[in-house]
Amino acid sequence: MKKIGLFGGTFDPIHNGHLHIARAFADEIGLDAVVFLPAGGPYHKDAASASAADRLAMVELATAEDARFAVSDCDIVREGATYTFDTVQIFRQQFPSAQLWWLMGSDSLMKLHTWKKWQMLVRETNIAVAMRQGDSLHQTPRELHAWLGNALQDGSIRILSAPMHNASSTEIRRAGVSDGIPPAAARYIREHGLYEK
């Protein structure tokens, strides 16, 4: 059975931490592919600094060297707010017999119960969690306790041994383009004058 990982994010800009966790996701779960999904209008985050087209281009450039990585614009081309459940449904239709895995950080796991159709989402896809420094499953909200206990037992949620990278896109934007960005994406940023103060 084919295993496909889905990695959604604003990627504003994509950085080496994203690539590191995507590789760990692929390795630890045994994925055939990791599909990067740049957000169009992210529901749970503030507006992006770079346009959707620029963020898509940077992700395509940054992921080109790993044959396991693919990029989809499905969250960009959809009208209105994009929700994870709807994105997973698109991939479920494209790959009906595949095992789908959604990658999220532990910060997102703590808010999962606020996501649209979250209970249906966790029936449609497995969840891989990259823990952020200082986070613990003991901090999980009460609304998720029963589901989390069952999911840990049946293997439909996996906690990755690779921690989430400390770098954030916000910090990288504030500091300016640095070593934390893949060279092809850094070149694109310079050539297009993105994130200039």
Curated annotation (Swiss-Prot):
- Any one Pfam family here would be CTP_transf_like
**UniProt-recorded Gene Ontology molecular function terms:** ATP binding; nicotinate-nucleotide adenylyltransferase activity
CDD domains associated with the record: NMNAT
InterPro entries documented for this protein: Cyt_trans-like, NadD/NMNAT, Rossmann-like_a/b/a_fold
GO terms for biological process, alphabetical? NAD biosynthetic process
Q: In which pathway does it act?
A: Cofactor biosynthesis; NAD(+) biosynthesis; deamido-NAD(+) from nicotinate D-ribonucleotide: step 1/1
- Which keywords describe this protein according to UniProt? ATP-binding, NAD, Nucleotide-binding, Nucleotidyltransferase, Pyridine nucleotide biosynthesis, Transferase
Top-level division of the source organism's lineage: Bacteria
**Alphabetized SUPFAM superfamilies for the sequence:** Nucleotidylyl transferase (SSF52374)
Please write the reaction equations for the catalytic activity of this protein.
nicotinate beta-D-ribonucleotide + ATP + H(+) = deamido-NAD(+) + diphosphate
Reported EC number(s) for this entry are 2.7.7.18
Task: Give the enzyme's main class according to its UniProt record, as a single word.
Answer: transferase
Q: Which family does it belong to?
A: Belongs to the NadD family.
The protein's job, in short, is:
Catalyzes the reversible adenylation of nicotinate mononucleotide (NaMN) to nicotinic acid adenine dinucleotide (NaAD).
Give the protein's recorded name: Probable nicotinate-nucleotide adenylyltransferase
Q: Which gene encodes it?
A: nadD
